């Protein structure tokens, strides 16, 4: 076995000396087995008032998980956060999952309603979606389904380790290990999230709304980008090819590949004023700038979110 929870439990075992036997059961059966004492631990579970009556939880969370709503990759009827078209669509839920409560709240917030079907495992949910028994399925973000299309993400909540109510011996050992891990490996949760959650999302298709999808389809001419150089390795002209290259260009080409929006690059001199270039009407975007307060305060210029951070150093003899 491997994954986020397994990695966390392996770290805990370095302090407890435990060896694990993993039981592959439906989520409903896992909860029942834990309640009866048939199993000792469940890793990665949300804390609720109802669950606290039957289970004990670790003293601190071991990560954060969102609820993720998926549909089939070829479903052209539902787009990201397309609540109007989600209304009335049938959704497959995992029985006794915390995310079900989050989804109920989401429907109320966004004013849509979906008939629900319940399944014993995520595999059952996926099969129901593939067989067109449901239009969407809801899972946690720790599980990643690359062959499906994400249509909503919401309800980030902390995850804990659970044990049987009153099992103080096991939970005390878990809590002691977690406290030591926090002191000795403070970035463990961040690193595991990077490895098992963020890495899975990097090559995903963009989460486009219906309006954004229609815009991409409507783009006939390349978006013109003025690129301020010469700033190797960020942006520069390759001497052999005569073409623009560097981190900015690689990023924009990848963005173009994922989004389907074509770009056309034009080199600008290093002393180009980015605000004047943006206001000239010759370019749709200006690349190769460092955000500063002047640009942030400029009402006629809009900045994208940052995607690259660099440090400057003063060097002297």
Task: Spell out what each predicted region is.
Residues 1-46, 53, 93-95, 109-127, ...:
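Extracytoplasmic small-molecule ligand-binding "clamshell" domains
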Residues 6-15, 73-100, 155-211, 249-258, ...:
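Extended ligand-binding regions for polar small-molecule ligands
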Residues 18, 26, 47, 60-110, ...:
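A conserved helix-loop-strand patch within extracytoplasmic ligand-binding domains
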Residues 35-36, 55-57, 73-76, 90, ...:
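Extracytoplasmic/periplasmic mature domains of Sec-exported, cell-envelope-associated bacterial proteins
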Residues 48, 97, 143, 167, ...:
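Flexible, active-site-proximal loop/turn residues at the rims of small-molecule/cofactor binding pockets
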Residues 50-51, 59-76, 140-178, 229-231, ...:
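Periplasmic-binding protein-like
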Residues 57, 86, 150, 234-236, ...:
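Short clusters of hydrophobic/aromatic residues that line enzyme substrate/ligand-binding pockets
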Residues 63-71, 93-164:
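Ordered, small/hydrophobic-rich secondary-structure cores
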């Amino acid at each position: 076995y491997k994954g986020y929870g397994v990695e966390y439990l392996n770290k805990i075992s370095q302090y407890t000396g435990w060896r694990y036997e993993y039981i592959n059961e439906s989520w409903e059966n896992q909860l029942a087995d834990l309640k009866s004492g048939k199993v000792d631990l469940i890793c990665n579970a949300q804390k609720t008032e109802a669950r606290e009556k039957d289970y004990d939880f670790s003293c601190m969370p071991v990560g954060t998980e969102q609820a993720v709503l998926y549909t089939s990759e070829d479903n052209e009827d539902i787009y990201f956060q397309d609540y109007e078209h989600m209304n009335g669509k049938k959704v497959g839920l995992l029985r006794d999952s915390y995310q079900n409560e989050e989804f109920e709240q989401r429907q109320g917030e966004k004013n849509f309603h979906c008939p629900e079907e319940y399944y014993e495992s995520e595999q059952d949910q996926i099969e129901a979606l593939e067989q067109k028994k449901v239009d969407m399925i809801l899972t946690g973000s720790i599980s990643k389904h690359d062959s499906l299309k994400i249509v909503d993400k919401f309800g980030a909540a902390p995850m804990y380790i659970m044990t049987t109510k009153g099992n103080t011996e096991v939970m005390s050992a878990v809590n002691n290990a977690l406290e030591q891990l926090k002191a000795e490996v403070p970035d463990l949760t961040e690193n595991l999230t990077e490895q098992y959650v963020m890495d899975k999302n990097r090559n995903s298709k963009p989460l486009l709304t219906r309006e954004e999808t229609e815009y991409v389809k409507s783009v006939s001419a390349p978006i013109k980008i003025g690129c301020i150089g010469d700033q190797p390795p960020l942006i520069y002209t390759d001497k052999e090819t005569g073409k623009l290259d560097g981190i900015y260009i690689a990023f924009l080409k990848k963005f173009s590949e994922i989004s389907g929006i074509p770009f056309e690059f034009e080199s600008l001199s290093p002393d180009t004023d980015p605000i004047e270039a943006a206001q000239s009407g010759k370019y749709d975007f200006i690349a190769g700038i460092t955000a500063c307060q002047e640009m942030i305060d400029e009402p006629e210029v809009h900045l994208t979110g940052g995607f690259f951070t660099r440090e400057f150093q003063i060097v002297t003899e």
